[in-house]
Amino acid sequence: MEHKGTKILKTQRLVLRPFTTADAEAMFENWANDKEVTKFLTWTPHRNVEETRALLAVWEEESKRPDVYHWAITLQGEVIGDLALVAVRGENAHTGYCLSRKFWGKGIMSEAYAEVLRYLFKEVGFHRIESSHVVNNPASGRVMEKCGLRYEGTMRKAFRLLSTGEWEDIVYRAVLEEDYFDRK
């Protein structure tokens, strides 16, 4: 495996690229301030665009490292979501993603995720990619299923929603390198 970092990736409709601080307004307006989008995430909605800009400054600096994988999902030049490896352990990684609510249900996240999996397995050489979702967010699970991630188990009350303080069950899914190439 050879780390290659956040390279620009293209699909039929999307360009996936590293974030810059210039994305702050679009990120804030499209999802960072939206309570519905951030409900199942590990961070609360941003209160203002400066909070978003500060986060993007960190992400922009981190993206210079070859072992960091964090993409801005863009559609016709507009930043509409993000997809990242939130944990890398050797040749295994855990992904996380979110998308502007106005683009839900259009196959965009599945398209972006499929391209990232292609890159991670074919070009970088990862062995295993996993992800998880709150049981009450089945749409996220459908994205994973469409992209070949198999159900591995449910952890009971393993995630506390920041919005309500309630504990939620988490579903884990993963795809192995050999599973990925068997599907192709």
Give, region by region, the residue ranges found by the protein language model.
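Conserved GNAT-fold acetyl-CoA-binding loop/helix
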Residues: 36-58
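A short helix-loop-beta-strand connector motif used in the catalytic cores of GNAT acetyltransferases and
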Residues: 57-72, 81
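Acyl-donor (CoA/ACP) binding surface of acyl/acetyltransferases
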Residues: 1-26, 30-35, 70-184
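Hydrophobic residues in alpha-helical segments
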Residues: 31, 41, 63-64
